Amino acid sequence: MKSVIKRLTILFWAVALCSSVTAQLKRYDTDFLLSRKNFVMTVPIEIERGQIYLSVRMQGRLYRFKLDTGASQGVIYDDVPVRGLRELGYIKSEDAAGQSRQVATVQLPPFALDSLIISGFKVQRMRRSVRREGEDGIIGFALFHRGIAAKINTRDSVMTLTDRRGYFRQAWGEALRYRLKWHVPYVNVSPFAGVTEEVLFDSGSPMLYAINNESLAKMQATVPSVSRQIEGTTYGSHAMGHFGSEHSNKITLLALDSLRWGGFTLQEVHCSTVQGGSHIGAPLLRYGNLIIDPFRKQLIFQPYDGRTSCVVANHRPDIIIVEKRGRAMIGMVTEGGKAWEAGFRHDYVIEKVNGQPLTFDQFNSYQWVRDQEYEFTLRLPIGIATTIRSIWPLQYNQK
């Protein structure tokens, strides 16, 4: 969540820091218990920035979790107070930017998702990469592949959950069989005619589609139509993980004629390359329902109104902001865009706005006034400072 910010991919092998931790990790598993059997229920979901949020009640308090199929288990942020966490030890976790850390694993107290009580759910305890009000953590794909099927309907802001194995057996739609890698779902989509690519379905990513640099290079070498759909290249970084941003690198900008999910075609898709894995993200759910059927290992896309195609015609952001050492940094700037013309360049660190020093979190929550001009104090990679006056909001994307 890759994105932009990616989902946490958990590598399930123990880090033996001491004998007590090792003993705990030998008992660590991803199973959890449900309070009901043979059920079908519909729960409300919230859609914010195109992503899905679930409200749960735990220890008498409401918590709000992002539903992230690119995460295997989930996360509870370390600044969120929760009584009754059970510490399980440490595992090694790798984020969207390819950086890894040892992170604490904890078991949440029982929590209620509508009328369903879930007990024994394990998550990682870690700091948040981007501060967002009203987001306490992440619920990952384990919610489904451990025995719950679901239908996500963002148009009506509801999600159907069931433990009945055959409930979605006769469901219509474009079904893709998924393969679990690192406990998250990968499917084959077609970004170019005659070519398929295995990608992560990552509902935690705000990008409709992102393609790995090396994957694109291999396709370009064998498929003539790929070069025609390249708009240009730039340099920078635009994926943020839980442990930091990816390193600056070449980014290829693409205007795809089509992106095919089975028999459904998304037309005029603007996207770009990433250093991490290729993925298809939350914006897919703007165009239809999605059924997650863990019993048949299928993701079934149901286009709204039964269509076989849609025109996306999405706009690429002029500028992308990432975090570096606690500050907001220009991760990528599209040459010729408004941000480029204003003087912003990749790897410039934003130190002040109107003379006020800002951390990354403060920049992220700054109360911008539309069409107002601001003075930005920037630190260049060579160490010198400069100032730029620009109207905000610039068009930027941040996970």
Place the predicted regions along the sequence by residue.
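Pepsin/retropepsin-fold aspartyl endopeptidases
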Residues: 23-399
